[in-house]
Swiss-Prot record:
It comes from the Eukaryota. The keyword Signal does not apply. Its main location: plastid. One of its GO terms (biological process) is photosynthesis. It is found in: Plastid, Chloroplast thylakoid lumen. PANTHER family: PTHR31407, THYLAKOID LUMENAL 19 KDA PROTEIN, CHLOROPLASTIC. The keyword Nucleus does not apply. The lineage of its organism: Eukaryota, Viridiplantae, Streptophyta, Embryophyta, Tracheophyta. This is Thylakoid lumenal 19 kDa protein, chloroplastic. SUPFAM superfamilies: Mog1p/PsbP-like. Keywords: Chloroplast, Plastid, Thylakoid, Transit peptide.
């Protein structure tokens, strides 16, 4: 497992070497403009909390990739679990924000949930078509920021950005980023699957991050894509 730490320095280089959080890299060879959307379902299956999470319980969210043009269709698939492209956990009591068709077709936002007691404590997922494999970690993060002004600002003012690479039991690579910003914390997980780039975000203001650290890291770790059987 490799870890990279991004600090205030003009150097971009290999693992464990600092780079500038303020640098927003140009662009990948593949355009980020094209985006798919998804149709998804939240199951009522409870997930037991891990040690340190108190009595927090979760539901499993299943997302199935579809084009923005097909968003809102419900016909022909009574069990979306069988066609899920990705899953992640949602804390019991969090609310879903319905993503518009325009959002799905432009910036790739696919799903979003938030804490009704503090709406800026949330998790959401975006995905983009046309990515067969991951680029270097710093390039991926910088290109995500190109279409996300809030992420740009968070990186620009961050005290520290840490990244690492993990592989699951099938060998699929996931990039994990932790951004310690001004008054805000963000956990981002990125992977490629079936020619799509998936990015799962968990964001929280500093007080909620300090209070809900275990829950928020659980959400980060729960995200994965679903392989074809």
């Amino acid at each position: 497992m490799a870890t990279k730490i991004f600090l205030a320095s003009p150097v971009i280089s290999a693992t464990r070497t600092p780079i500038v959080p303020k640098a927003i890299a140009s662009r990948l060879g593949t355009s980020l403009a094209a985006a798919l959307a998804a149709t998804s379902v939240l199951t009522m299956v409870p997930v037991l909390p891990a040690a340190g999470e108190g009595n927090q319980t979760y539901k499993i969210y299943y997302g199935t990739a579809a084009s923005a043009a097909n968003y809102g269709g419900y016909g022909g698939n009574s069990d979306r679990k069988t066609s899920a492209e990705y899953v992640y956990d949602v804390p019991e009591g969090w609310k879903e924000r319905l993503v518009s068709k325009v959002e799905k077709g432009t910036n790739g936002t696919d799903s979003e949930f938030y804490n009704p007691k503090k709406k800026t404590e949330k998790e959401y997922l975006t995905f983009l078509a046309g990515f067969r494999q991951l680029a270097p970690r710093d390039v991926i993060l910088n290109n995500l920021a190109l279409s996300d002004v809030e992420l740009q600002d968070l990186i620009a003012g961050a005290d520290k950005v840490v990244s690492e690479e993990r592989k699951d039991e099938t060998g699929q690579v996931y990039y994990l980023y932790e951004i310690d910003g001004v008054g805000k914390h963000s956990l981002i997980t990125v992977t490629c699957s079936k020619n799509r780039l998936y990015a799962h975000f968990v964001n929280a203001p500093a007080p909620e991050w300090n209070r809900d650290h275990d829950t928020l890291t659980h959400l980060r770790d729960s995200f994965k894509t679903v392989s074809s059987s």
